[in-house]
Amino acid sequence: MSLTIDVKILDNRLHHMLPSYATPGSAGLDLRACTEHTQTLAPGETIMIPTGMAIHLADPHYAALILPRSGLGHKHGIVLGNLVGLIDSDYQGQLLVSCWNRGKESFILNPLERIAQLVIVPVMQANFNIVDDFQASERGTGGFGSTGRQ
């Protein structure tokens, strides 16, 4: 299944490096740091990084998620400051990435470095039906480890 999304390039350097899927099975498109200069993220610091692009999904049955890149988080402690970025279908502004250095060492971020990934997901909007009680289930109200570890 394929979806066509309107993309506005805000940084001319991206014209030759648009996000693309690395493999046929890839779910995420890499987003790049469209900064003018190298930036240093000190331990514990969070900064907003422009991606140089805007998208408009237009269809309320879709949303985009900005997620961390696994290598940056595991090897360098660079994750998203908001953990997940949710891009609503009607948002048209530049995609920004909140980068947080949860590591113990400073991290050097170079211009056009891949910093996060964008995943397009289907969305179902819910209507609420108010009830006095739920039909009983096997789990009931058990949570937070109630099903065990093994």
From Swiss-Prot:
<feature type="binding site">
    <location>
        <begin position="86"/>
        <end position="88"/>
    </location>
    <ligand>
        <name>substrate</name>
    </ligand>
</feature>
<keyword id="KW-0546">Nucleotide metabolism</keyword>
<dbReference type="InterPro" id="IPR036157">
    <property type="entry name" value="dUTPase-like_sf"/>
</dbReference>
<comment type="similarity">
    <text>Belongs to the dUTPase family.</text>
</comment>
<dbReference type="GO" id="GO:0006226">
    <property type="term" value="P:dUMP biosynthetic process"/>
</dbReference>
<dbReference type="InterPro" id="IPR029054">
    <property type="entry name" value="dUTPase-like"/>
</dbReference>
<dbReference type="GO" id="GO:0000287">
    <property type="term" value="F:magnesium ion binding"/>
</dbReference>
<dbReference type="InterPro" id="IPR033704">
    <property type="entry name" value="dUTPase_trimeric"/>
</dbReference>
<keyword id="KW-0460">Magnesium</keyword>
<comment type="function">
    <text>This enzyme is involved in nucleotide metabolism: it produces dUMP, the immediate precursor of thymidine nucleotides and it decreases the intracellular concentration of dUTP so that uracil cannot be incorporated into DNA.</text>
</comment>
<comment type="pathway">
    <text>Pyrimidine metabolism; dUMP biosynthesis; dUMP from dCTP (dUTP route): step 2/2.</text>
</comment>
<dbReference type="Pfam" id="PF00692">
    <property type="entry name" value="dUTPase"/>
</dbReference>
<feature type="binding site">
    <location>
        <begin position="69"/>
        <end position="71"/>
    </location>
    <ligand>
        <name>substrate</name>
    </ligand>
</feature>
<keyword id="KW-0479">Metal-binding</keyword>
<dbReference type="GO" id="GO:0046081">
    <property type="term" value="P:dUTP catabolic process"/>
</dbReference>
<protein>
    <recommendedName>
        <fullName>Deoxyuridine 5'-triphosphate nucleotidohydrolase</fullName>
        <ecNumber>3.6.1.23</ecNumber>
    </recommendedName>
</protein>
<feature type="binding site">
    <location>
        <position position="82"/>
    </location>
    <ligand>
        <name>substrate</name>
    </ligand>
</feature>
<dbReference type="GO" id="GO:0004170">
    <property type="term" value="F:dUTP diphosphatase activity"/>
</dbReference>
<dbReference type="InterPro" id="IPR008181">
    <property type="entry name" value="dUTPase"/>
</dbReference>
<keyword id="KW-0378">Hydrolase</keyword>
